[in-house]
Design a protein with these regions (language model features):
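Short secondary-structure junction motifs
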Residues: 52-55, 136, 166
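Short coil/turn connectors at secondary-structure junctions
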Residues: 97-100, 139, 162-165
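Short, electropositive alpha-helical surface patch
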Residues: 154-166
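C-terminal helix-cap and adjacent tail motif
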Residues: 2-17, 164-199
Length: 199
C-alpha cells in the first residue's frame, strides 16, 4: 500500500485516507482465522437499535472456493441458460479471488417494533466496520455485491428467506499501489439547516 491510503499512524489519519482495494488484485497473506474472529468481534460494536444483531457472517475458506464457483455457475445458468463463456469465467474468477472471503447476510428480525429500514442501516454499518477492522490489521478489503447478491439460489447457499446477501467482503494484501477514485464534493452532500421565517 502507498502512504497515501489507509494510513494507520492514527485513527484521524486513517479515516480520511481509507481506500478499498480490488478483490482481483489481492494476494496472500490474508487475515488468519484468529484475525478474522477479531475482525468480526470488532464489527459487533456497530450501532444496533434494539440490540437485534440483524446480520450474520459466513467465512468461505480457500478449500471451499471451487465448490462455491460451481454453485455460482449452476445458479447463473439456471437463471440465464444462454450465458456465454466470459460471463461464466467472471463467476469463476469472483469465487477464487483474494485470500479471504466473508459473506455478510442481512438477517432481519420480524418480531420487533424496530423498522426493517433501521435494521438495514445497521447491517450496512456492520459491513463498514468489518472493512475498517480489516484495514486496522494492515490488510486491504473490498465489498462487492453484483448478481450473486440478488439471486435466491445463491442466497440459499448461506441463509434463507427473509435473509439477503448484504455483500461479499474480500480481504488480503494489495498487489501493487492503490489508486484514488472520484469522491463527491463536500458542498454537494453537506449543508446546514435554517428555519424559514413564518409569515
Amino acid at each position: 500500500m502507498t502512504d497515501m491510503f489507509n494510513d494507520l499512524s492514527s485513527l484521524s489519519s486513517y479515516l480520511p485516507s481509507r481506500r478499498s482495494g480490488r478483490p482481483r488484485n489481492m494476494v496472500a497473506p490474508g487475515p488468519s482465522d484468529e484475525e478474522i474472529e477479531s475482525i468480526v468481534a470488532i464489527a459487533l460494536r456497530t450501532p444496533d437499535h434494539g440490540k437485534l444483531a440483524p446480520w450474520r457472517v459466513i467465512q468461505v475458506d480457500k478449500d471451499q472456493r471451487g465448490q462455491l464457483a460451481a454453485e455460482l455457475t449452476k445458479a447463473y445458468q439456471t437463471e440465464k441458460p444462454d450465458a456465454g463463456r466470459l460471463e461464466l469465467e467472471a463467476l469463476e474468477t469472483m469465487a477464487h479471488q483474494a485470500p479471504t472471503l466473508l459473506v455478510v447476510l442481512f438477517s432481519p428480525v420480524t418480531s420487533t417494533k424496530i423498522p426493517v429500514w433501521e435494521q438495514q442501516l445497521s447491517c450496512g454499518a456492520f459491513c463498514m466496520n468489518i472493512i475498517h477492522a480489516i484495514h486496522a490489521k494492515d490488510f486491504v478489503s473490498g465489498w462487492i455485491t453484483g448478481w450473486p447478491a440478488y439471486n435466491d439460489d445463491v442466497r440459499d447457499l448461506f441463509g434463507r428467506t427473509p435473509e439477503r446477501v448484504a455483500g461479499f467482503i474480500f480481504a488480503g494484501t494489495a498487489d501493487g499501489e492503490l489508486t484514488e477514485r472520484p469522491r463527491p464534493e463536500l458542498d454537494r452532500v453537506f449543508s446546514k439547516w435554517k428555519s424559514e421565517p413564518h409569515n
